[in-house]
Amino acid sequence: MKVLAAGVVPLLLVLHWKHGAGSPLPITPVNATCAIRHPCHNNLMNQIRSQLAQLNGSANALFILYYTAQGEPFPNNLDKLCGPNVTDFPPFHANGTEKAKLVELYRIVVYLGTSLGNITRDQKILNPSALSLHSKLNATADILRGLLSNVLCRLCSKYHVGHVDVTYGPDTSGKDVFQKKKLGCQLLGKYKQIIAVLAQAF
């Protein structure tokens, strides 16, 4: 299920994800503007690069932890079950302007954040003893929240962008156990792939 929402208010909801809360509720703000609660840091782009590098450095370990925790048939069928075949994933163009790349990064991080929330919720039910996986998912979500905050600051402070249409990650609540595991694996495969591209692009 895709939910389109616009602007800073849904973003602020995403910035306060609770693990396992699923997709944030869509809210359409009235005349969305750049409302930042705290001053932006001077070295925002360095922080964004650092956070992307941190995510890129841990993405493969998260992917391995995930598919290992799912058990068979996942570890021996990665291409078939965990290929990054996510059709509604937001696009990214590495050769765009900084502003265009930041807008696309914003969309991607919102999508990934809600996806991770759904994956974490599902894994706590499907694999309650996989504590290292839960911890890694939570740590990744924390970095994504910080990254999102920095991207918002940069877009608002430098480019006066207060309105971006976003697509949230797919809701898995109505899917069966195998489909939840498979979609999670595909999303983390896509995450591993795109985060490497993003880390190189900034």
UniProtKB/Swiss-Prot annotation:
Pfam families: LIF_OSM (PF01291). GO terms for molecular function: cytokine activity; growth factor activity; leukemia inhibitory factor receptor binding; signaling receptor binding. Keywords: Cytokine, Disulfide bond, Glycoprotein, Growth factor, Pharmaceutical, Secreted, Signal. Disulfide bonds join C34-C156, C40-C153, C82-C185. Gene3D superfamilies: 1.20.1250.10. It comes from the Eukaryota. GO terms for cellular component: cytosol; extracellular region; extracellular space. It is found in: Secreted. Residues 1-22 form the signal peptide. GO terms for biological process: blood vessel remodeling; cell morphogenesis; cell surface receptor signaling pathway via STAT; decidualization; embryo implantation; fibroblast proliferation; gene expression; immune response. Glycans are attached at N31, N56, N85, N95, N118, N138. SMART domains: LIF_OSM (SM00080). LIF has the capacity to induce terminal differentiation in leukemic cells. Its activities include the induction of hematopoietic differentiation in normal and myeloid leukemia cells, the induction of neuronal cell differentiation, and the stimulation of acute-phase protein synthesis in hepatocytes. Belongs to the LIF/OSM family. This is Leukemia inhibitory factor. It comes from Homo sapiens. The gene is LIF.
